[in-house]
């Protein structure tokens, strides 16, 4: 399982880029 998670992009990648302001 660890291998599968490692293969996937980091949690940060899932979230929108910092450039895009959060839907406030």
UniProtKB/Swiss-Prot annotation:
Domain of life of the source: Bacteria
Ranges of biased composition (kind: Pro residues): 15-24
* Keywords, alphabetical: Antibiotic resistance, Leader peptide
Q: Name one GO biological process term.
A: response to antibiotic
Chain spans, region Disordered = 1-24
Biased-composition ranges for Low complexity?
Answer: 1-14
Q: What does this protein do?
A: This peptide is involved in the control mechanism of the synthesis of the macrolide-lincosamide-streptogramin B resistance protein.
Its recorded name reads Erythromycin resistance leader peptide
């Amino acid at each position: 399982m660890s291998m599968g998670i490692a293969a996937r992009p980091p949690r940060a990648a899932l979230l929108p880029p910092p450039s895009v302001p959060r839907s406030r």
